[in-house]
Regions:
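N-terminal glycine/serine-rich phosphate-binding loop of ATP-dependent small-molecule kinases
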Residues: 1-97, 109, 125
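Generic secondary-structure signature for well-ordered alpha-helical cores
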Residues: 60, 64, 116, 145-152
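Short alpha-helix plus adjacent loop in nuclease-associated cores
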Residues: 100-117
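Generic structural marker for isolated residues within well-ordered, non-membrane alpha-helices
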Residues: 59, 111, 120, 140
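Gly/Ser/Thr-rich active-site cleft segment
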Residues: 2, 10-12, 23, 91, ...
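Short glycine-centered helix-capping/turn motifs at secondary-structure transition points
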Residues: 66, 118, 156-157
Length: 157
């Protein structure tokens, strides 16, 4: 049965894994919700360790429910949470901070500063995208500015 295809859907409120047979029919699914963290109004975070652990669990359970083994997996597709942003230590694999979720608006002041003096149009011209709290760039700036030791770690590579 080496023609199983897995799909991991790591979404805003849960992580699910579906197994499909050679004909593309779903044969198993397992899903687990994860905690939503709201440290301040407008801020939304997820625990990246919880997400990683639940991802591993849903994959194992979907394979088990499909009556398959890991060696039976022919392909894997992954979807993720849009612009949710995580930074981690490349040596330890540990996150420096909770994931900042795509709906989080803590970067509104960064966006306002970047958009002064008609820069909104400049950014759209260069990137094709508007300045918005949605995107990962402002989230990374916020993390570099606010997480103790992160900027120094980034500068060290």
């Amino acid at each position: 049965m080496s023609d199983i295809v897995l799909a991991i859907d790591q979404g805003t409120t849960s992580t699910r894994c579906m197994a499909f047979n050679h004909s593309g029919e779903p044969i198993a699914v397992h899903q687990l919700e994860h905690q939503q963290i709201f440290p301040k109004p407008g801020w939304v975070e997820h625990d990246p360790i919880e997400i990683w652990e639940k991802t591993q669990l849903v994959v194992r359970e979907a394979i088990k429910k499909a009556g398959a083994n890991p060696g039976d997996i022919a392909a894997l597709g992954i979807t993720n949470q849009r612009e949710t942003t995580i930074v981690w230590n490349p040596k330890t694999g540990q996150p420096y901070h909770n994931a900042i979720v795509w709906q989080d608006v803590r970067t509104d002041k960064i966006i306002a500063e970047l958009g002064k003096n008609d820069s909104q149009d400049r950014f759209r011209t260069i990137t094709g995208l508007p300045l918005a709290t949605y995107f990962s760039g402002p989230k990374i700036k916020w993390l570099l500015d606010n997480v103790d030791g992160l900027r120094e770690a980034a500068n060290r590579g």
